[in-house]
């Protein structure tokens, strides 16, 4: 190998061989390969990710959403205690609430008995007996009434038993409307087969009229409504 290298060195002037690798020669196209060139640097990455300002803004928005969600969860939790200020606020709201018939205008009695015939034998015919089923049916049959579409929708779904599936509070609202149109000061009113729940009882007494008594047949003595009125000493067994 050594003699071979010497022969190559003697074939031409050193300057001629160096010219082959000169920049000028490569520029003119004499040689296409660049032996001494450095590898090209990779193109800079396109950093299109979110900047710091965007990340900071998203963090703030997330914190706000979390706080609002926590507040809503707290509101939905049952309240077992109230501060003195909250208690006074609630009591003031109750005092400002005015029933449709203030105390003393009507004598209203609830009855868990459905049959008005038996009640009339006990209480007489002078009282105004109101059947909630008939009241609701009258509004369902009135095409001009704003509740007619809703009542017929519930009726088409549940049939004759639809009274049990009315939206919460609707029965009390319809009874209040009926009594406003048909009751006069001094009337003695008996509402048959009502209330169906303690919620209905409280809503009625807050928004329509207070009730002086709950008439209870023997088979309904264990109902929640009966027990509720027993605590306030307003129940009477039939």
From Swiss-Prot:
Recorded GO CC terms: mitochondrial membrane
Transit peptide, UniProt annotation: 1-35
Membrane topology: Single-pass membrane protein
Name of encoding gene: AIM36
Regions that span the bilayer: 49-65
Chief place where the protein resides: mitochondrion
Family in the record: Belongs to the AIM36 family.
Lineage start: Eukaryota, Fungi, Dikarya, Ascomycota, Saccharomycotina
Region forming the signal peptide: none
Name the record gives this protein: Altered inheritance of mitochondria protein 36, mitochondrial
Compartments where located: Mitochondrion membrane
Keywords, in A-Z order: Membrane, Mitochondrion, Transit peptide, Transmembrane, Transmembrane helix
Organism: Zygosaccharomyces rouxii (strain ATCC 2623 / CBS 732 / NBRC 1130 / NCYC 568 / NRRL Y-229)
């Amino acid at each position: 190998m050594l003699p071979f290298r010497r022969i190559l060195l003697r074939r031409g002037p050193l300057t001629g061989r160096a010219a082959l690798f000169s920049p000028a020669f490569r520029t003119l196209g004499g040689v296409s390969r660049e032996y001494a060139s450095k590898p090209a640097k990779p193109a800079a990455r396109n950093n299109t990710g979110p900047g710091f300002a965007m990340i900071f803004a998203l963090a703030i928005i997330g914190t706000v959403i979390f706080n609002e969600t926590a507040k809503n969860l707290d509101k939905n939790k049952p309240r077992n205690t109230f501060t003195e200020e909250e208690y006074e606020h609630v009591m003031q709201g109750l005092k400002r609430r005015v029933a449709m018939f203030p105390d003393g205008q009507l004598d209203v009695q609830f009855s868990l008995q459905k049959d008005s015939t038996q009640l009339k034998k006990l209480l007489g015919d002078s009282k105004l007996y109101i059947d909630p089923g008939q009241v609701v049916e009258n509004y369902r049959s009135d095409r001009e009434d704003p509740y007619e579409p809703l009542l017929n929708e519930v009726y088409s779904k549940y049939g004759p038993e639809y009274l049990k599936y009315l939206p919460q509070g609707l029965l009390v609202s319809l009874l209040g409307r009926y009594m406003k149109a048909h009751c006069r000061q001094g009337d003695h009113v008996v509402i048959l087969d009502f209330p169906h729940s303690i919620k209905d009882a409280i809503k009625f007494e807050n928004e329509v009229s207070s009730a002086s008594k709950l008439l209870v047949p023997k088979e309904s003595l264990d109902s929640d409504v009966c027990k509720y009125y027993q605590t306030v000493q307003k129940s009477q067994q039939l």
